[in-house]
């Protein structure tokens, strides 16, 4: 059965590129435009989500807040969460790790690298 990934990013073009890349590799993708929508879709689809991929800088709820909120929910305590963001400072990466991020990818991203990381994390 195909694995399901929640992709959260306020940039429509980034979401579309991420979704296209992942769908072409056989993954099912649920898209959300910000952390609030991402949280709602995560809760509604908790039983099928295998990975969350989130941006950091978004309106309404940023990526770190989304990660912390998801990690507080029993159904997402062990779900891999990857940050896909323009933020590349060591301080921000440490904040991401402290919040519960599994890994970090920097935009702009190479679609092949994205697939490589996703396959390593969830198969």
Predicted regions and their residues:
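Acidic, metal-coordinating helix/loop segments flanking the phosphotransfer/catalytic sites
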Residues: 31-51, 94
């Amino acid at each position: 059965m195909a694995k399901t990934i929640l992709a959260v990013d306020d940039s429509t073009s980034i979401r579309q590129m991420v979704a296209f890349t992942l769908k072409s590799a056989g993954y099912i993708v649920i898209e959300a435009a910000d952390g609030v929508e991402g949280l709602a879709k995560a809760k509604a689809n908790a039983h099928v989500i295998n990975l969350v991929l989130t941006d950091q800088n978004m309106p309404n709820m940023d990526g770190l807040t989304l990660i912390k909120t998801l990690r507080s929910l029993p159904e997402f305590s062990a779900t891999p969460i990857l940050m896909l963001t323009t933020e590349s400072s060591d301080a921000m990466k440490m904040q991401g790790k402290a919040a519960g991020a599994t890994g970090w990818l920097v935009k702009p991203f190479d679609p092949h690298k994205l697939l490589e990381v996703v396959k390593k994390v969830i198969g």
